[in-house]
Swiss-Prot record:
GO terms for biological process: negative regulation of DNA-templated transcription. The lineage of its organism: Bacteria, Bacillati, Cyanobacteriota, Cyanophyceae, Synechococcales. Residues 49-139 form the ATP-cone domain. The gene is nrdR. One of its GO terms (molecular function) is ATP binding. This is Transcriptional repressor NrdR. A zinc finger (unnamed) spans 3-34.
Length: 159
């Protein structure tokens, strides 16, 4: 690792520890030339995932787009910023684990809906209204009724 002050490539590791919930390793280093101490992070390089759009085009998976869409759906709900980040990380992990290189945008949308439904019904309705392009009140009512029906089924299975 190159020293940020003298650009020497020889350094020794003083300390290593897991960081970012085990997704990276934080290393404290010391330059053998100038004794400057600095921190580096080591992460696994993931294979890029391509998203196949409805119009047939292809683009690289963008975690920020996912975060933005879910954040909008979760505005003014009890979802904290940290919970949204964890939710997005979970969706990203599922996408990376379940796909080789390509995933349809519709699969991502359905995966988000499936997970949002379990976490927060308001965020689910908001996301569904945009993703499924609700045209009117009837679309909201039918989605609310399906939520209401699944809630009754869950209560019946608990009893």
């Amino acid at each position: 690792m190159q020293c940020p002050t003298c650009q020497n490539t020889d350094s020794r590791v003083l300390e290593s520890r897991s960081a970012d919930s085990g997704k990276s390793v934080r290393r404290r280093r010391e330059c053998l030339n100038c004794s400057f101490r600095f921190t580096t992070y080591e992460r696994v390089e993931s294979m890029p995932v391509s998203v196949l759009k409805k119009d047939g085009s292809r683009e690289l998976f963008d975690k920020q787009k996912l975060f933005t869409g879910i954040s909008r759906a979760c505005e003014k709900t009890n979802f904290s910023s940290e919970a949204i980040i964890n939710f997005v990380d979970g969706i990203e992990s599922q996408i990376v684990q379940d796909t080789n290189k390509d995933i349809k945008s519709s699969q991502i949308g359905e995966l988000i809906l499936k997970n949002l439904r379990k976490e927060n019904e308001v965020a689910y309705i908001r996301y569904a209204s945009v993703y499924r392009k609700f045209n009117g009140v009837k679309d909201f009512i039918s989605t609310l009724e399906s939520l209401k029906g699944s809630s009754k089924n869950q209560l019946a299975s608990i009893s």
